[in-house]
């Protein structure tokens, strides 16, 4: 956190709000239910908004992730890879494509913003709480340990409701504030 800066940026990270995670190959009713909440959060957020986009290639099933989760999803260029239309319409910057759960590029971008302008807080929302949200939250926490980080649980969904709740507790243990 940049010392002595009074007008620091607040940042919202919208994690993987893509069709395949909402109502496609890996979609759930819980994921579909948060779309309006995420849309409202973006519309009302006073600060910079970044989107991540899970991005796989046609050879996904040959990758480590594909061997452990043999469900092709978020294949570059497909409808499932696209950010949900009503959310994408609110996007002002290019999404940060990531080949795995967490984005080192995102953490690096945030570190540069903090060094240049200062970051007041970072809030994460999106999918899936128990995979990509926690992965990005912990990467960001490791990169910016003095910046307050929170996850809005009302704008997240996990693979299951149980895994969603479990991972919220894990993030709290790592000093990530959970908004319920």
Give, region by region, the residue ranges found by the protein language model.
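Active-site acidic carboxylates
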Residues: 2-95, 116, 150, 159, ...
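Histidine-anchored nucleotide/phosphate-binding helix
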Residues: 37-42, 134-144
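Internal catalytic-core helix/loop-beta-alpha segment
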Residues: 77-131
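A short glycine-rich beta-strand->turn/loop micro-motif centered on a GG-aromatic cluster
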Residues: 123-127, 146-161
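Short amphipathic alpha-helical surface patches that serve as generic macromolecular interface elements
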Residues: 133-137, 150-153, 168
């Amino acid at each position: 956190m940049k010392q002595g800066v009074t007008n620091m940026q607040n940042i919202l990270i919208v994690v993987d709000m893509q069709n395949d995670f909402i109502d496609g190959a890996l979609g759930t009713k819980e994921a579909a239910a948060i779309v309006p909440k995420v849309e409202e959060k973006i519309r009302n957020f006073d600060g910079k908004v970044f989107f991540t986009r899970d991005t796989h290639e046609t050879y996904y099933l040959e990758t480590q992730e594909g061997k452990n989760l043999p469900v092709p999803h978020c294949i570059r260029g497909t409808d499932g890879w696209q950010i949900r239309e009503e959310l994408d319409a609110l996007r002002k910057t290019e999404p940060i494509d990531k080949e795995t759960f967490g984005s080192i590029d995102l953490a690096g971008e945030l570190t540069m913003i903090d060094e240049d302008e200062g970051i007041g807080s970072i809030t994460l929302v999106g999918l899936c709480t128990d995979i990509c949200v926690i992965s990005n939250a912990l990467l960001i926490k490791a990169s910016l340990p003095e910046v307050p980080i929170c996850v809005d649980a009302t704008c997240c969904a996990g693979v299951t409701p149980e895994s969603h709740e479990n991972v919220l507790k894990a993030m709290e243990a790592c000093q990530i504030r959970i908004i319920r």
